[in-house]
Amino acid sequence: MYNLNYKQLISIIIPIYNTQQYLSRCLESVINQTYKNLEIILINDGSTDNSLSICQKYKSKDSRIVLLNQQNSGQALARNNALDIAKGDYIAFIDSDDWVSLDYIQALYNHVFSYSADIAISAMVGCNKQIKAAEIIPSNINIFDNNDAIIKAFLSKQLSSMACGSLIKRKLLDKQRFRNFIAYEDLDFFYKIYSQAQIIVKDNNVRYFYYQRDDGIMGANRLNFSLQHLQALKSVTTYYERFFIEKYPQLGSLIYMNILRHLVDNFSEAAVRKNVLAKDVLLLYKT
């Protein structure tokens, strides 16, 4: 049974850039959440389509919506600007072309409340034109109740490195912001967040639906794969290696396997893309 205590304010952060076709679906799923004590922060990142007008329409009918308008600066800065003004005890990130089940926030809040968790994570599923219904399996959760267990689960890919799909205690975010990488900004961000967490609940029920499209940020990044991507990843893995090896020496082999996996993935990607040579991948990792 859900805990219906709405005393704690939850801030939902939604960066928006040219998603007019999908935005209403996203916002409808958010404003109709069963958990009502919400601050909904929309950040229009210089959209050139009708996204801003859609945001203004929703703001006019829901007093919980806060609308920020900025010049196009990227998703990282949009999220950071929202974090700077967010008032919630917990923070959730949702992408503007995605949507969530109506009990999404309530389910995650129930987990953080019941287990005194720092983070609750929902299972996610990618959808294209077909809208999939949430599959709810009672008690289908995993609890990671110490930092070593959390880091091990993260390194073994049991825990997501995506900002979306999580409810995060505000205190974990007070000193953390997204770095403005062309890619891997979520990965960079969550290395640091997970290192602070003591209890994480992973709900294996699907309540977050991400839309798979060729013109989204991830689609564009795949098409424009370049050395900028590699430099961003190198920065992340350098921190990854230094920080995690020092703090978790007992997980050394798992840490190095993750670094190797990233290298192999990027070497393979470089072989596919004509604008980056495989030798450039090796050169970057040797420096």
Which ranges hold each PLM region?
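C-terminal subregions of glycosyltransferases and related glycan-biosynthesis enzymes
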Residues: Y2, Y211-T287
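N-proximal low-complexity "stem/linker" segments adjacent to membrane-targeting elements
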Residues: M1-I31
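Short loop->beta transition adjacent to catalytic acidic/histidine clusters or analogous donor-positioning motifs
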Residues: K7-I10, I31-L42, N50, D62-V66
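Donor-binding/catalytic cores of nucleotide-activated saccharide
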Residues: Q75, S96-D203, Y210-F225
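Glycine-rich, basic loop-to-helix element that forms the pyrophosphate-binding segment
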Residues: Q70-A86
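Short aromatic/hydrophobic "clamp" motif used to bind/position activated sugar donors
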Residues: I91
